[in-house]
Amino acid sequence: MQAGKPVLYSYFRSSCSWRVRIALALKGIDYEIVPINLIKDGGQQFSEEFQTLNPMKQVPALKIDGITIGQSLAILEYLEETRPIPRLLPQDPQKRAIVRMISDLIASGIQPLQNLSVLKQVGQENQMPWAQKAITSGFNALEKILQSTAGKYCVGDEVSMADVCLAPQVANAERFKVDLSPYPTISHINKALLALEAFQVSHPCRQPDTPAELRT
């Protein structure tokens, strides 16, 4: 690997990994990917080698500037502080708080309830309804918030950290067959985001570890 080049430990379908891939693309940061398959061999995140990088045994993890950072929002905050152009957090403190609120609603209030480790615990037959309930509950709140904050994107007309979190979560909703018709604001924003190059190149269907049958 090229010395000094950031290295992202990622799984193609991980929405948390996708958040980081979007941010890296938006900020024009060249990086390398090390795929961590969360299914194969019982989950490569449980290997001793990976646990030395991230004791939480989760992706993403980003090696950058001589440190390794786990947790996607911590990574996004670090990238924003060290490479602030283009901005993902507005300068206005109130708008910045709203962006962080939406990001945290998704990253803490929705995604963890339907991630792989939780779904394994609820049993195969309960996974779909469990995930649907978790996402629907969160989207009910998110839709109401976005109705008052959105412009073209989640908070006004500039892409922010909230958008970086939104698109991957909508992809999860689609994968779990959530009816998105009650969420026109979410759907409208997501459509606009997926038209952007940074969201396309970082998409799960275009990653080095994407299975051939899922590539587009």
From Swiss-Prot:
Known cofactor(s): glutathione
**Cellular localisation:** Cytoplasm
Recorded GO molecular functions are:
glutathione transferase activity; identical protein binding; maleylacetoacetate isomerase activity; protein homodimerization activity
| PTM (free text) | The N-terminus is blocked.
What's a Pfam family in this record? Answer: GST_N_2
Q: Which reaction does it catalyse?
A: 4-maleylacetoacetate = 4-fumarylacetoacetate; RX + glutathione = an S-substituted glutathione + a halide anion + H(+)
What does the entry list as the binding residues for glutathione? 14-19, 45, 59, 71-72, 111, 115-117
GO cellular component term, pick one:
mitochondrion
Q: Which residues carry this modification: Phosphothreonine?
A: 136
Q: Name one GO biological process term.
A: cellular detoxification
Give residue numbers for the modification (N6-succinyllysine).
Answer: 57, 177
Kindly list the positions at which N-acetylmethionine occurs in this protein.
1
Q: How is the cofactor bound?
A: Glutathione is required for the MAAI activity.
Kindly state which keywords UniProt assigns to this record, in alphabetical order.
Acetylation, Cytoplasm, Isomerase, Multifunctional enzyme, Phenylalanine catabolism, Phosphoprotein, Transferase, Tyrosine catabolism
Instruction: Identify the metabolic or biological route this protein is part of.
Output: Amino-acid degradation; L-phenylalanine degradation; acetoacetate and fumarate from L-phenylalanine: step 5/6
According to its UniProt record, where is this protein mainly located?
A: cytoplasm
As stated in the Swiss-Prot or TrEMBL entry, residues carrying the post-translational modification Phosphoserine are 137, 181
Q: Domain GST N-terminal spans what residues?
A: 4-87
Q: Where is the GST C-terminal domain?
A: 92-212
> What is known about what this protein does?
Probable bifunctional enzyme showing minimal glutathione-conjugating activity with ethacrynic acid and 7-chloro-4-nitrobenz-2-oxa-1, 3-diazole and maleylacetoacetate isomerase activity. Also has low glutathione peroxidase activity with t-butyl and cumene hydroperoxides. Is able to catalyze the glutathione dependent oxygenation of dichloroacetic acid to glyoxylic acid.
Q: Which family does it belong to?
A: Belongs to the GST superfamily. Zeta family.
Subunit note = Homodimer.
Q: What is this protein called?
A: Maleylacetoacetate isomerase
Organism of derivation: Rattus norvegicus
